[in-house]
Amino acid sequence: MGACLAIFLARRGEEVVLFDAAHAPLTGASRWNEGKIHLGYLYANDQSLSTAAHLVTGGLAFAPLMEELTGRPLKKIAPGDDLYLIHARSVVPPDQAGAYFARVSQLVRERAGGARYLKDCADARAYALSAAELGAVAGEAIVAGFRVPERSLCTVTLADQLVDALAAESRIVHRMGTLVREVAAIDGDEGAWRVHGEAFDYVVNALWHGRLAVDATAGLAPPPGWSHRYRVSAFIRTTHDIVAPSAVVAVGPFGDFKAYDARTFYASWYSAGLLADSGDVAPPSPPTLSGVAKRDIAQRIASELGAHLPIVREVFAATESVAIEGGYVFAQGHGALDDPAATLHRRDRFGVRRKGRYISIDTGKYSTAPWLAHAVAQEIAR
């Protein structure tokens, strides 16, 4: 979010200072995630369709906005549609999931911009897998499957492109290795704000980790019911080509698998990768993982996810390199994903909050970042 907004503002003639506690931009969850460009299919336990309706606009706008930001075509886009594999312990039964997927497909068809998505989804449809199709890809605990027109891309590759785009903008000053703990209005909320002793016409808080604590210093109280989860996953490069589908084990605390191309993969299992879950305003520092701990996580992902999607075992067996990486994810929701009543099953409470010229952005999902950044840039640089 911060990188996207900085580039949009600089190209509108604004002088921008970009603060980051890390040594370089885009080193956390914005680099290390599955890269799903959401259309809303994942949130089948939100039968109101509110989450899908809030996500779909940003998802459809993602590709053209990102290509505008980087000046390059997007790379390493998963070549196949996502498979949603319904687990026997899913919090949403197969018939209900199928009906939900059909409603989301209709929503996508009704929105403008379907042809601009990672693939043309202007005529979006969800298809139930036959028994033979399901048996060819899934393990015994999977009771149904659906093919939906949702895609993912390799976020590591895109992060590198965004870093290059940031470096090319002369109006952006980089303050790396600088932790922002507080902000202060200088002469009322509608005037300048101070950060690290400097005055700025606008201050935008685009943090994932620590945003609420900084908001509090601005006098912006957090809405109730949030969570900070620190999650890691496996980012895999294989020694040779493997043809594999991208799939999500749904709906609950399971896992997913992305095939960006024939040698670049992502794999996760929720309980293996969830290393912290905090409802504090300031969550704990990210855990430091030893090499042994990372190997254990990789082995558990391979075992748990591989039991439901056997091709995963073949991918792990052919590993040339594997990185266990991730970051903090903020959600305006909480609870256990195996609880149908958990508010974490809804992700429609994200967006922009303001106090004068202090702006706080809850990005919501990776896929909605450029859309929100573009809107905020238009507001600031009119």
Ranges and model annotations:
Residues 89-169, 340-344:
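Flavin (FAD/FMN) cofactor-binding and adjacent substrate-gating region
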Residues 143-149, 157, 307-382:
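C-terminal catalytic lobe of FAD-dependent flavoproteins
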Residues 35-129:
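Dinucleotide-binding Rossmann-like beta1-alpha1 core, especially the glycine-rich loop
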Residues 106-111, 275-333:
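Flavin-binding catalytic cores
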Residues 142-216, 369-379:
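Helical element adjacent to the flavin cofactor pocket in flavoenzyme catalytic cores
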Residues 2-3:
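N-terminal Rossmann-fold NAD(P) dinucleotide-binding loop
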Residues 25-26, 196-250, 260-263, 287-291:
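Central helical "cap/lid" subdomain
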Residues 10-32:
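Glycine-rich FAD pyrophosphate-binding loop
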